[in-house]
Amino acid sequence: MSKDLISRLERQFKLKRDEFQDPLELLKFEKNLDYARKLLWEEGKCQLDKVAEPQGLSKRIMDLQGRIYDLNVTMEKKLKIEEKKIKSKQEKEIAHALQSIQERELRERQQMSNVEASNAQLLTNQRSMQTEISESLLHLASVLKENALSFTNALVTDNQVVERTGSLLDKNAHSLRHANHGVQSYSKSKRLSFWLQLGMIIAVVVSFIVMIFILQFTKNQN
């Protein structure tokens, strides 16, 4: 039974040697080889006089173990090389990542500095605008106060002018009424004198006609 297992392991090692590059496959093969050695001891076929036999099972097991050892050494070398490559790659990736982080932190600090500078400039501009607005409001309040005082003084002056104008208008109205009364009296007296003059003229004309009539009548009698 152990002989069949060893033969099968030898064929497997010869046919699938490339698959033993995988540590798991190689470990599985080693377990099978240990199991074959165990069977060999149990069957009592591991005597010392058979170790040197060319076709002895112990010799064949030792040969497989030597090959496995060589594979392990080769695999360890490859693993070390791969480990160095992976380590180098990881170091490069870590260095690149650290550089990227440093560059990003630098950009963020620069952006923060720019933002702080922009905020400071913005605050300065806002304070300047607030100062200008406050000064403008104070100036506007002063102008409004002056205009209010001027308007009040103008109202007082206008009231005085209105009062004086009203007094003058009252005086003028009284004078106009007096003048109107005089004009009316003058018109009445003028109309009377007109009729008187007209009457006198008529009387003179009538007297003249009467005189002419008398003179004519006197001539006719003579």
Swiss-Prot record:
Task: Establish whether keyword Flavoprotein is in the entry.
Answer: no
Mapped to this chain, the residue ranges on the Cytoplasmic side of the membrane are 1-193
Primary site of residence = endoplasmic reticulum
Name the domain of life.
Answer: Eukaryota
Chain ranges on the Lumenal side, renumbered to this chain? 215-222
Q: Name the Gene Ontology biological process terms.
A: intracellular protein transport; retrograde vesicle-mediated transport, Golgi to endoplasmic reticulum
Q: A single GO molecular function, which one?
A: SNAP receptor activity
**GO cellular-component terms in the record?**
endoplasmic reticulum; endoplasmic reticulum membrane; SNARE complex
- Give UniProt keywords alphabetically: Endoplasmic reticulum, ER-Golgi transport, Membrane, Protein transport, Transmembrane, Transmembrane helix, Transport
Name the family: Belongs to the USE1 family.
What are the TM regions of this chain, as residue ranges?
A: 194-214
Where in or outside the cell it occurs: the entry states: Endoplasmic reticulum membrane
Provide the protein name: Protein transport protein use1
Query: Pfam families from the xrefs?
Result: Use1 (PF09753)
> Topology versus the membrane, per the UniProt entry?
Single-pass type IV membrane protein
Q: How does it assemble?
A: Component of a SNARE complex consisting of ufe1, use1, sec20 and sec22 or ykt6.
* Protein task: SNARE required for targeting and fusion of Golgi-derived retrograde transport vesicles with the ER.
- Origin organism is Schizosaccharomyces pombe (strain 972 / ATCC 24843) (Fission yeast)
